[in-house]
Amino acid sequence: MKQYTVKEIEALLPELEGESDPRWEMLRRDERKSVQALLARFVKQKEREKAARQRWEELMRYERELYAAGIERIAGIDEAGRGPLAGPVVAAAVILPKDAYLPGLDDSKRLTPAKREALFAQIEECAVAIGVGIVSAAEIDEWNIYEATKQAMAKAVAALSPSPEHLLVDAMTVPCALPQQRLIKGDANSASIAAASIIAKVTRDRWMHELDRRYPQYGFARHMGYGTPEHLAAIRRYGVTDEHRRSFAPVREALGVQS
């Protein structure tokens, strides 16, 4: 049988029909180190692809149960920015198509900024609908962060077109009349919620980068508004902006305001 060049093998590997293909056994017997290294990389890539597909099927469990019940438009809901001392709380709602496949999708907190940005673009391209709700720091101070988060989620759902038939929500209840399921750690257990977590996180991070350009002395692009030593020191030195949550204890304490 013909001995392939390494370049020919690179082109051939994607065509092989698994290890039962007679050409696979021929390649395994090839003693050239370059060929064996190529095969090892190919096997690892296939293992990664298999793991990604298995993870995707795990993430789609709740969605598939609803599809089986005849429910088509399922929106995942999640938020970003409940804990920071500055900036808005952002919620997102995402309806994915039934045939969606987004390998690498996961809870946004588990992903690098570059991976989140890449998935953000993929979600935008494939989603049936995306809605975003933003509630400002002033509104958070007026309502409290829990109520503000619920209102951000309600805004995100209202922004969806077409409207969803059912909601999967990360650990909260959205104030609306739609049927919904509250899932603990939903962003790690539902594809729709994980997609919403990406949209919410990237949207809020971009917002904070814009604030960093307006208020460079606070370091918003580095800490995203969280209460880091750098941020607290900046508040003590420069005071607060309109984007700071004055009702949050660390901000009050940094300003010397009693609870």
Swiss-Prot record:
Protein name as catalogued: Ribonuclease HII
Recorded GO molecular functions are: manganese ion binding; RNA binding; RNA-DNA hybrid ribonuclease activity
Residues of the RNase H type-2 domain: 72-259
UniProt xrefs under InterPro entries: RNase_HII, RNase_HII/HIII, RNase_HII/HIII_dom, RNaseH-like_sf, RNaseH_sf
Task: List locations, semicolon-separated.
Answer: Cytoplasm
Q: Among the record's GO biological process terms, what is one?
A: mismatch repair
Gene from which this protein is expressed: rnhB
The EC designation for this entry is 3.1.26.4
Native organism taxonomy? Bacteria, Bacillati, Bacillota, Bacilli, Bacillales
